[in-house]
Amino acid sequence: MSVNQKFEKTGSIAYLCDEYLKNNFIDPEASERLGVKRGLRNPDGTGVLAGLTNVCDVVGYDLVDGKRVPTDGKLIYRGIDVEQIVRAAYAEDRFVFEEVIWLLLFGSLPTPHQLASFKQVLEAHRELPKDFAEDMIMKAPSPNIMNKMARSVLALYSYDDNPEEQSLTNILSQSIALIASLPTIMVNAYQIKRRVYDRQSMYLHLPQPGQSTAEHILSTYRADQKFTKEEAKLLDLCLVLHADHGGGNNSTFACRVLSSSGTDTYSAISAAIGSLKGPKHGGANHKVMEMLGYIMEGVKDHSDDTEIAAFLRRILRKEAGDGSGLIYGMGHAVYTKSDPRAVILRRNAEHLAVEKGFEDEFRVLCAVERLGPDAVREVKGTKDVCANVDLFSGLIYRMLGISEDLFTPLFAISRIPGWCAHRVEEVVFANRIMRPAYKYLGHEQEYIPLEERG
């Protein structure tokens, strides 16, 4: 019996909702009046400084005389511009996500010997514990892969003979094992979801030796286990660009908050997955693909900038699209002139888009990137808006034949190295539980004995 069915049997939830709304209200204007930093953001849009980190920096503006000045965006992993990492990967024709994992965790670039050894360690941890897939995934499937991934991470606590210890040795061991095994959990959860909820055939492939993380995902996801190197490199690029985004993004901050309490690695990473599952954080590329469908249908000439710009203005006026008034894939809390991840994805995805028959869709998204800022300025009066990484990532996954069920889970696979790096840093160096304040606004009332209540 579902939760809703139980309420239908025992009493109406609508009555309880009415009771809540009758007795609870917070005036939105009270936050400004009392100096509350809603969303932990300052009035100028900058984030409230909540901690220190060596892991990652996100640069989207300069502060000049206390004011934000737009600048081209940069994403910095341990002091290295991600643009440099990506250019090296393509120049040397190799996969670099594993190198980025090392860089984020340890703060240095691995030597060839260190990288080769580290890849072997990751490969050794890809296979799940004995009977784990059967007991923890098959017997309790979920229609939502993020939900199943979070539950599976928590379940791995029971397979660890020392889950609670907070030593650097233990946390790093747990982190590396989770980074390696989470892609296998994701694909297993998806295949079983296909079988149980979609009534389609499932394919459970074992990890193959000598593969990068991107190759491992494609070979276990696809029925025939076949893929091209160009496909795997584009997925590797997506993993690299999503690997971290500073300590203040919602899921990483959630991981750091839990880590500050002294809880175990499995609880902290599961909480981060739960945060990323939220549509305000990790689900935007779904909405971009939905919006792209509206544009492809509503615009007659997909090469006509004037027609596309007019349609974007209609979206902003809530006359087209899903009625939200939002151009999905546009705007970011930090980036102002450009999101380097979007720039890099656009630059490297075009060839495969043409090859896979998605040239029209790709060019429409490029037009949205180009025309969107002016449309937002004209309709909303908002300045400093640029395309973000979500504008192109969803189409890339579709080009790779990846189900939308896995769009956000792939984000989690990408981001877990960052989560783990921030967890280690929080435990080793911060060593103080996070405990911000909340202002009480409730009114006083007298306790009334039960028999006297009307």
Model regions: which residues?
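Non-transmembrane, aqueous-exposed alpha-helical and coiled segments at domain scale
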Residues: M1-G454
